[in-house]
């Protein structure tokens, strides 16, 4: 298939696109490249691409495309809190418009990168795909709104699928340090402290970005009737941890590290555990391969290789919200998160 991947130059996209190509699919990317300066230790995969904001996508951008994988958007809760109205404009309105255009273009598969943040504040209960939504951030709410507005577009010719990713971790050419396991390992290596900004009690499901990418591939290649207008939790049911448990794993992986709690550490209102059994039952080709300990070991080795420093991961290069603020303050982005110079299309 010829697959259009929005957000292909982001944290997940730069891992997903080579996987798709290795499986024999033709890939074209679409990305505004807000994080083009955030490359970590390796080159971003070179694929034909369109440099464009998802708010500006037109029908002709889908020419020759068989399937869409939609990853683009403001990528996490702190970014969503930066400007909630803008979050809904980009993450919700532009996503629904993208799906509507894809359907009009005759595309049969639309795979949406949703999130377990849709469950929000849910306590200790184990949640499957039928659980009630309870998002607590604009980011989580925007994901719910997209799922609810794209589902009615489904018909005999258009099959949307929502993949509700657990909290991601792992090494990527566009690495993020604002994710819990990535962040804890970075603190442990650079300072000897596993720095806890919450009290460690909330539950969080986690999943490696390679396993997220495998889920996208499995959904793409599955018989249509298995994924038509369906939602799947993406991860492993065994990979639900309290944040304090993740800190203990990092402590065991990173020598001479110790766990420290911030003076103002309190409970994080985001707390949820998810049941991920459905996706492996329905899509047997999806076989997740990572767990938290192996992921922490991978991150530790990658950080050692580049001699990571605190100023690297706490500064604007890799911290998504600070990077956006830096681009705005330097005049490169306007307050609507559009490049001040005209976007260009390349390579297609």
Regions found by a protein language model. Give the residues of each.
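C-terminal substrate-binding subdomain of Rossmann-fold SDR/epimerase-dehydratase oxidoreductases
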Residues: 192, 197-348
């Amino acid at each position: 298939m010829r697959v259009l991947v929005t957000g292909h130059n982001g944290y997940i996209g730069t891992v997903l696109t080579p996987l798709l190509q290795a499986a024999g699919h033709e890939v074209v990317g679409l990305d505004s490249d807000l994080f083009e300066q955030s490359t970590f230790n390796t080159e971003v995969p070179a694929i034909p691409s369109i440099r464009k904001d998802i708010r500006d996508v037109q029908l002709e951008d889908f020419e020759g495309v068989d399937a869409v994988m939609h990853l683009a958007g403001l990528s996490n809760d702190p970014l969503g809190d930066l400007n909630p109205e803008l979050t809904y404009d980009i993450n919700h309105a532009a996503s629904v418009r993208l799906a509507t255009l894809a359907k009009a273009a005759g595309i049969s598969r639309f795979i949406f990168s949703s999130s377990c943040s849709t469950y929000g504040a849910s306590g200790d209960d184990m949640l499957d795909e039928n659980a009630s939504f309870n998002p607590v951030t604009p980011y989580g709410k925007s994901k719910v709104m997209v799922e609810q507005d794209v589902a009615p577009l489904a018909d005999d010719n258009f099959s949307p699928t929502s993949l509700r990713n657990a909290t991601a971790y792992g090494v990527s050419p566009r690495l993020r340090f604002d994710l819990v396991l990535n962040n804890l390992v970075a603190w442990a290596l650079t300072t000897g402290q596993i720095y806890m900004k919450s009290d460690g009690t909330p539950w969080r499901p986690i999943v490696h970005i390679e396993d997220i990418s495998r889920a996208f591939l499995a959904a793409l290649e599955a018989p249509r009737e298995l994924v038509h207008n369906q939602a799947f939790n993406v991860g492993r049911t065994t990979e639900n941890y309290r944040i304090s448990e993740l800190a203990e794993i990092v402590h065991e992986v990173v020598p001479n590290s110790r766990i420290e709690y911030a003076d103002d550490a309190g409970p994080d209102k985001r707390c949820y555990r998810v049941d991920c059994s459905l996706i492996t039952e329905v899509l047997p080709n999806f076989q997740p391969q990572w767990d938290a300990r192996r992921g922490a070991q991978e991150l530790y080795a990658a950080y050692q290789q580049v001699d990571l420093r605190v100023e690297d991961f706490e500064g604007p290069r890799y911290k998504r919200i600070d990077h956006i603020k830096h681009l705005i303050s330097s005049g490169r982005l306007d307050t609507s998160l559009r490049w001040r110079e005209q976007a260009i299309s390349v390579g297609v």
